Design a protein with these regions (language model features):
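Bacterial N-terminal signal peptides
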Residues: 10-20
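Bacterial N-terminal signal peptides that target proteins for export
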Residues: 2-10
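Secreted/extracellular ectodomain signature
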Residues: 23-199
Length: 199
C-alpha cells in the first residue's frame, strides 16, 4: 500500500485480511490471512470497517476462500474506537499456499517471524510487490500501533476511520519488512501516510 514519487498513500490501497473464527473451527492450512490484491479504488475511503470487511470478503470469495468471516486488519479511533487485534480472532492464520504465518495474536504482533514478503501473499497466492519492485506496494493500511491497538493521541491515524480520500493520514505497515519510517521493519506500524488519497 506506497509510491516513492509523491507518496500520497499507496500505489494501490492494500489491506491485510484475516479470517476470524473460534479456535479449532478451521482446517489446518486453509487460507485465513492475505493482503488484498486490489483496493476498492477510492483511496483510504473504504466505507468504514464494514466496507473494508466486505471488500476483503468479496476478494476471498472470488479466490475460493468463502465460508468464513473476514475482517480487515484495521483499527479505528475516537469514541467507540476498536483495536485491529480484537477483530481478528485467535489464530492460527495461514496464507493462500497453506503456510502458517502466525499461530496466535501474540505471535502475530510480537515475534512475527512468519510474516515476510514471501509469506504475506495475496488472496490469489501471489507475492505482493515490495519496496524494490515496480510499482512499490509495500505499504498496507492498518491504523494500528505495533501491538495491534488503536491510537489514543487524538491525531488522525485512520483517515477519518476509513471514510476519507483527501486530507488526513493513516498508519501503514510494510509487508516486506523494509523501508523508511519510524519502525521500518514493522508489518503493521511503520509510519503515517502523507494523506488519504490514492496515487
Amino acid at each position: 500500500m506506497t509510491m516513492i514519487r509523491m507518496r500520497f498513500l499507496v500505489g494501490a490501497i492494500m489491506l491485510v485480511a484475516l479470517a476470524a473464527f473460534p479456535i479449532f473451527s478451521q482446517e489446518e492450512g486453509e487460507m485465513s490471512f492475505f493482503i488484498t490484491s486490489t483496493g476498492p479504488g477510492d483511496g483510504a475511503n473504504l466505507g468504514g470497517l464494514d466496507g473494508a470487511d466486505g471488500h476483503c470478503a468479496m476478494l476471498a470469495q472470488a479466490a475460493g476462500g468463502g465460508g468464513k468471516t473476514w475482517h480487515a486488519y484495521l483499527s479505528t479511533t475516537g469514541a467507540g474506537g476498536v483495536n485491529a487485534r480484537d477483530r481478528i480472532g485467535s489464530g492460527p492464520w495461514y496464507n493462500a499456499k497453506g503456510v502458517q504465518v502466525a499461530a496466535n495474536v501474540d505471535e502475530l504482533h510480537y515475534s512475527n517471524v512468519g510474516l515476510t514478503k514471501e509469506t504475506q501473499l495475496s488472496e490469489k497466492g501471489e507475492m505482493v510487490n515490495g519496496r524494490n519492485d515496480d510499482p512499490n506496494q509495500h505499504d498496507i493500511l492498518t491504523g494500528s500501533q505495533l501491538d495491534g491497538t488503536r491510537f489514543t493521541d487524538g491525531e488522525d491515524h485512520t483517515c477519518g476511520n476509513w471514510t476519507s480520500n483527501g486530507e488526513g493520514s493513516a498508519q501503514v505497515g510494510h509487508h516486506d519488512r523494509t523501508g523508511g519510517g519510524a519502525v521500518a521493519s514493522s508489518w503493521n506500524a511503520a509510519h503515517g501516510s502523507r494523506n488519504c488519497g490514492q496515487t
